[in-house]
Amino acid sequence: MAQYTNYILVCGGTGCRASQSEQIIENLRAAVEQYGLEDTQVIRTGCFGFCEKGPVVKMIPDNTFYVQVQPSDADEIVREHLVKGRKVERLLYMNPETRELVPDSKHIGFYKKQLRIALRNCGFINPENIDEYIARDGYVALGKALVEMTPEEVIKEIMDSGLRGRGGGGFPTGLKWQITRKVQAPQKYVVCNADEGDPGAFMDRSILEGDPHSI
């Protein structure tokens, strides 16, 4: 498996895709190849959440955050940031109050108070690559539930956690599983209800697009 020291994360959420993020990805990959940067990988991620500033490009490991990037900016980003070691200042986020440039996304007001739990992988991994999800401890809980626990223990764990549905009703998940467990039927189904019409569930799209394996 190839080893990389630099990663270029490009938002592949609906908003950024509508603003040519796919062309940005293509141009970035072409520039990386042109400059012979074998230690650099371009990754399409899920939504970063900061859609009003998209398309968004994030450089890892230094967390430089470029906003409103255009396909024509790709070569400059690779040449200046990776080859010459200089940030492309005109693409950095500007604090609207202080007018100061904020290179690191951790210091942007929109992000700095966030504690992501359900959305922890969105904007960080390639949603179509199961290996990247597993590398972030993906499916560990599922493995434990299937191998180390009984169905009753799993339901009790969910009940005790207080986990609720993400829709407006907030129905207790453990109770839902308990009711389903008691139903006598030769075959049962798991249905993913991703309702974007519910104002309280608009985040469903972000998870489905950006971290589908978590579903």
Question: What positions do the PLM features span?
Answer:
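Feature of Fe-S/electron-transfer and energy-metabolism proteins
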Residues: 1-215
